[in-house]
Curated annotation (Swiss-Prot):
PROSITE patterns: RNA_POL_H_23KD
Catalytic reaction list: RNA(n) + a ribonucleoside 5'-triphosphate = RNA(n+1) + diphosphate
Record's function text: DNA-dependent RNA polymerase (RNAP) catalyzes the transcription of DNA into RNA using the four ribonucleoside triphosphates as substrates.
Protein name stated in the entry: DNA-directed RNA polymerase subunit Rpo5
Family membership: Belongs to the archaeal Rpo5/eukaryotic RPB5 RNA polymerase subunit family.
Subcellular location(s) per record: Cytoplasm
Encoding gene (name): rpo5
GO MF term (any one): DNA-directed RNA polymerase activity
Length: 82
């Protein structure tokens, strides 16, 4: 079955929730932490989660991670070309 998606990476219990943030959210993130876009950790456009989200280079991904000590925390990554 070439070309047919058979599995979603987000269905796996170890893969945290991902989403592409809006331009307004991106500007607020940069302002809140007083950083430049280039200072964010990077994630490649070929990453399976990024591909499934349909994100493109320049987008920022918000990752919601669960921690036994911190509860839930947000992590941000900049999508870059391979």
């Amino acid at each position: 079955m070439a070309g047919k998606k058979e599995f979603s990476v987000f269905m796996h219990e170890l893969v945290p929730e991902h989403r592409v943030i809006s331009e307004e959210e991106k500007e607020e993130l940069l302002r809140r932490y007083r950083i430049r876009l280039s200072q964010l950790p990077q994630i490649k456009a070929s990453d399976p989660a990024v591909v499934e989200l349909g994100a493109k280079p320049g987008d920022v991904i918000e990752i919601k991670r669960k921690s036994p000590t911190a509860g839930v925390y947000l992590y941000y990554r900049l999508v870059v070309e391979d």
